[in-house]
């Protein structure tokens, strides 16, 4: 079952409320990764401080949100920061995104996959009501910044995220990808979101599927450092965890090694087609033995989200049974 939470106030306030809400889980997860975090802090402290200074200039309020989470959960702030700096801890995730546009349907579907050792209580659907007037909803792994999975805001922008193999982590002095994605969901239009991603340089890479539910448009955006590729989607599209845009794939495809990503992309292609209706996609993505995965895959689908662009609603499926319905 997916837990729901509403947080209100300043960035520090919402962080504190999230930290208090998920205190037990945050402590368990940090304890699990304590040795990794301590090693990184000892060996890469100067780089961490340099990155924090860059974030302090670019988006200081996000650091305040992390301080709030740390205080609410009563844990070490540095550990919370490292949890939101996956480039320096060399951590990553894996998900699947599908978009189908045909005579009947226009929708985005996204599987949120995480390691099977995690439990559902680690996640929550959080409604953010910030003091500055921003409003958005985000499916959050407790202790992380919003919009690393899927989110939608008051401007009608829906966003889902797929980790991409990073190619240029030599310079970690820019925005970590979690910070970039948190800033992205605050954008007031699809145009602003695209411009933001083009101007910003992050430490690694992400794939963003952005849907404008008001104007019925969708784009796929791949990022790697300072390079951005934008692709307008008009019919059928799917993505896992490696670059597939021509701007990147011709250069990097043969060098990539990202676990099950290519296999899952092929499975996704074999399971779905452009004429599928929403019911078929839901059945494919939410059924344990049909979702895009390969044998011995340790990842589990914790939630599947469907953003119906025509009807402007969000359906979130969990454990084949629970369904949460929201407007976007």
Residue ranges: model-predicted function:
Residues 1-75, 85-86, 102-107, 111-328:
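C-terminal, well-structured catalytic/ligand-binding subdomain of enzymes
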Residues 78-98:
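Short, glycine/charge-rich beta-strand/loop segments that flank catalytic centers
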